[in-house]
Amino acid sequence: MEGEVATNGVILKHNGVKDISLETCWPEKKKPVEATSLSSGSSDIEEEISVECPKRVANQRRKRSKADEIKTKSSRKRKCDDENKCEENEKKQRSSVKKRATTWKEEEVVVDDEKKCEQQLQLVPSSKATSRSRSKKSVSVDTWLVNNEIDVSALSSRSESELSDSYLKTEYFNDCRSMTRSLKANLGELAICHQCSKGERRYLFICTFCEVRLYCFPCIKKWYPHLSTDDILEKCPFCRGTCNCCTCLHSSGLIETSKRKLDKYERFYHLRFLIVAMLPFLKKLCKAQDQEIETEAKVQDSMASQVDISESLCSNEERVFCNHCATSIVDLHRSCPKCSYELCLNCCQEIRGGWLSDRPECQLQFEYRGTRYIHGEAAEPSSSSVSEDETKTPSIKWNADENGSIRCAPKELGGCGDSVLELKRILPVTWMSDLEQKAETFLASYSIKPPMSYCRCSSDMSSMKRKAASRDGSSDNYLYSPDSLDVLKQEELLHFQEHWSKGEPVIVRNALNNTAGLSWEPMVMWRALCENVDSAISSNMSDVKAIDCLANCEVKINTLCFFEGYSKGRTYENFWPEMLKLKDWPPSDKFENLLPRHCDEFISALPFQEYSDPRSGILNIATKLPEGLLKPDLGPKTYVAYGTSDELGRGDSVTKLHCDMSDAVNILMHTAEVTLSEEQRSAIADLKQKHKQQNEKELQEQNGLEEEEVVSDEIVVYDETSGALWDIFKREDVPKLEEYLRKHCIEFRHTYCSRVTKVYHPIHDQSYFLTVEHKRKLKAEFGIEPWTFVQKLGEAVFIPAGCPHQVRNLKSCTKVAVDFVSPENIDECLRLTDEFRQLPKNHKAREDKLEIKKMVIYAVEQALKEVETLLLDRS
């Protein structure tokens, strides 16, 4: 019997198996488990907390009638002859209440002693967190809840309208104080705050959900400003999964990172889709190796099947790179027996073809002309000069012999120039060819039909689309922009794949809505890093190396000062905004270890986890590398940067135009807006005029150019949720974009605000940021424009490999990004790998950090293993 199943746009035919219906496996929502009480009276108190019992109603009526009685007496007193004295007494009473009472949203005022206590509260709570076991503390808490006369649930059930009355405010806080005294009397040393581990707090609030944890008022106000004390009583931050105390922040496994579990049928279809996509590239790699073996057979004057290839000694923890082009070597390569110089197969072909590039070293250096020049004034006498040697060095000859053999590289290129390079292997003999044959055999049993179209963006669905460009006659001016809830559906994954295969960016809205809500305040993250970690790491966290966006240089700054500037802003002496940014902080190789909860929270927020999950994404080729093999650093990486909504034109908080070798997804986790004063705005306007005059003078002196007036025609709109402005270019427009940048390179500034005079690669140099004016000129001269859109808080932006992009921060932003490798973009990854190897030596983008060829072969191997296991389970 023959059946068909469709997934990922692929139709599977199989023999002897019944038709399989592809159903999305939705994890059932677990109901919160009610806290079990260890005392005999726990059921009574739970009933009293959960329902509106007659006793509570009578209690509340009695309190309201008492409040009405007080109001009546107060009104009668106003009619007495001693009216002035009564008013004076009332003022004193109100003043006393204001010092003692607390409201949830508008008037949270603490008594003087509490203020002193809050001032004494250290920025970083004590790292000596006490472990509180359920077995000991829960019994005491349960006993206290049963025997205590204070109605905790009645406190949490009152509305703001009830608490607006002064009498009820006072009574409420007296009850809270009485509750705290009772807690301390019954629990003793265990009556401590879960957040700061201190027991001398005046107000402690117990969670009625877990009946275990307590939080003090200063910690609630400082670390959980979005929660009221009623919220804490109902469900504490720990039970909500948002506790940011040091102990919890260093705990892993508390957050479920996977949103949707795949059943075995879905896994089978995804793996088959991956094998289909990878096989053509595996064949190319095998073909290149077969050609090299045939060449070696000619050198040895033997048959290809008789060529003996010795194994190169290489461990799994070692990366092997070509000494000439810095490309990763996967299997076959040539090596010098004398000096161990190693050459990849691509370089071997280029030597035999006679088109090998010398790849000279990059000599780019920018001249420092002083801080006055950076701010638009005259340059200071230069103490340094630009060391660019424009004289062309003679080309070094490196040719192959007539039989195809290649000698070691000349000494000028790092070799010895003496011995003939020998053919070496890293993998077992015929391992790759056997893998290719195995994949072909597997796919031969199944037929493939053209995929169906799942795109519904052509219909009137404004919620799924976002306008990002105004290209004439183009059908891709709108970007696919689903909600995070929609992406959990199987049909939306197919919808995503259709846009993704075209090289289009994707924006997913509200990615943080499905997370626990952990705080991404930079101060919370910094506190977690400074406590409960190795002392050496903790000491290194006191200072950070940030990038000054104006001079484009690293500056060392105190970590606390940096984060204060994140929320309050920083300026130079002339009131020009100082824009600083931290890249990859903390380092991504330590991010998961130092901030495990934040790492789990980020992964749980990732949409389309079949692609983006860095741990177990079934269509993420980077996850297929076997254990023990050295893996590339793909993140997650954190980016913390200042920002302002107005485009300054010089020193903006930006990520300059660049192109990533792999796919990436970037989520805006936190923003903070810094308001500029009128004095600062006036100073900025004056300084912009100085910058303009400086530009006009320099351009006139160099090329007779004149700076044009900026006329903005951008379609983006900013609002309170806006965070970052993105410009992403189409792959097809890259040649025209590069031509424009080479033509106008002198108009751009980079390090020390010096003009860009030398271009090695207009995109990979990362020296350019296109302002509004440059984007207008680009469209006028070359007819191309990027997708331009604003990333809002909680939005995830998917960037395909090979799409040049730039970002400008409209506010202080905390973004987290992770790289991944999708089957649809393997061809682009390989193209970029070859493009990077053509860059000069010591160019920052030259190294093959991705090792995409290695990923391809191991992805096919791992997918075949998993498919075989699934087939055995089905049989």
UniProtKB/Swiss-Prot annotation:
Keywords, in A-Z order: Iron, Metal-binding, Nucleus, Oxidoreductase, Zinc, Zinc-finger
Tissue: Expressed in inflorescences, roots, siliques, leaves and stems.
Main location: nucleus
GO MF annotation: an example: histone H3K9 demethylase activity
Domain JmjC span(s) in chain numbering: 614-837
InterPro entries for this protein: JHDM2-like (IPR045109), JmjC_dom (IPR003347)
Ranges of biased composition (kind: Basic and acidic residues): 79-93
Annotated positions binding Fe cation: H658, D660, H805
EC number: 1.14.11.-
Zn finger region (B box-type): 317-347
UniProt: Zn(2+) 2 binding residues: C207, C210, C236, C239
Sequence motif Nuclear localization signal, residues: 62-69
Entry binding sites for Zn(2+) 3: C322, C325, C339, C347
Residues annotated as binding Zn(2+) 1: C193, C196, C216, C219
PROSITE patterns documented for this protein: JMJC
Cofactor(s) required for function per UniProt: Fe(2+)
SMART domains in UniProt: JmjC
Ranges for region Disordered: 31-103
One Gene Ontology cellular component: Set1C/COMPASS complex
Function: May function as histone H3 lysine demethylase and be involved in regulation of gene expression.
Family: Belongs to the JARID1 histone demethylase family.
Descriptive protein name: Lysine-specific demethylase JMJ26
Native source organism of the sequence: Arabidopsis thaliana (Mouse-ear cress)
Gene name of the record: JMJ26
